[in-house]
């Protein structure tokens, strides 16, 4: 797990490298599904908590103020139910990991998912003081799991999103 968060930590560190040492801690909100809310494990072991601890150990003053996520959430549910809560939290940094349930539960097309994810990104960036303070975490690669069929769909989606 540690290797998997090294790149996000590095990228996040670069985004905040110019932050003054005596500045107020960065207000961080994590948005997502069961991966984000740490279903089945303690919150301190969730990836948002681990990312926060890694950034703190790198000298970045940051506080994870809220994990806005739901078990089984799709991108549409996140748009409808989670996004209205974001504005009042006044985040300065947001991570987004969503999409697995779109594929598993809904089986949506990549074009429909692309529309939803772009809408989520726009809404998040509109609630941030700097649109560069959003870290988008991709859907996990299922190619090494029993759900290999989903892995092929995810890979195709990611390639389309990168276009």
Range-by-range predicted roles:
Residues 1-9:
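Bacterial N-terminal signal peptides that target proteins for export
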Residues 61, 80-163:
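Alpha-helical cap/lid subdomain in secreted, periplasmic
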Residues 21-69, 84-88:
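Serine-esterase "nucleophile elbow" of acetyl-processing enzymes
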Residues 8-17:
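Bacterial N-terminal signal peptides
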Residues 72-81:
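Structural motif
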Residues 69-71, 138:
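Residues at the C-termini of beta-strands that transition into short coil/loop
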Residues 35-42, 71-72, 102-111:
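Second-shell loop/turn segments in exported
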């Amino acid at each position: 797990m540690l290797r998997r968060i090294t790149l996000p930590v590095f990228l996040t560190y670069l985004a905040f490298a110019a932050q003054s040492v005596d500045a107020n801690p960065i207000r961080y909100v994590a948005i997502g599904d069961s991966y984000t809310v740490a279903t089945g494990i303690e919150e301190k072991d969730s990836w948002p908590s681990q990312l926060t601890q890694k950034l703190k150990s790198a000298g970045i003053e940051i506080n994870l103020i809220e994990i806005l996520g739901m078990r089984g959430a799709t991108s549409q549910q996140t748009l409808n139910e989670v996004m209205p809560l974001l504005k009042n939290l006044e985040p300065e940094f947001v991570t987004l990991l969503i999409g697995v349930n779109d594929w598993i539960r809904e089986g949506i097309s990549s074009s429909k998912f692309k529309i939803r994810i772009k809408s989520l990104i726009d809404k998040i960036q509109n609630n941030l003081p700097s649109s560069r303070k959003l870290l988008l975490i991709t859907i996990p690669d299922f190619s090494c799991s029993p759900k290999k069929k989903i892995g092929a769909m995810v890979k195709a989606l990611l390639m389309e999103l990168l276009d």
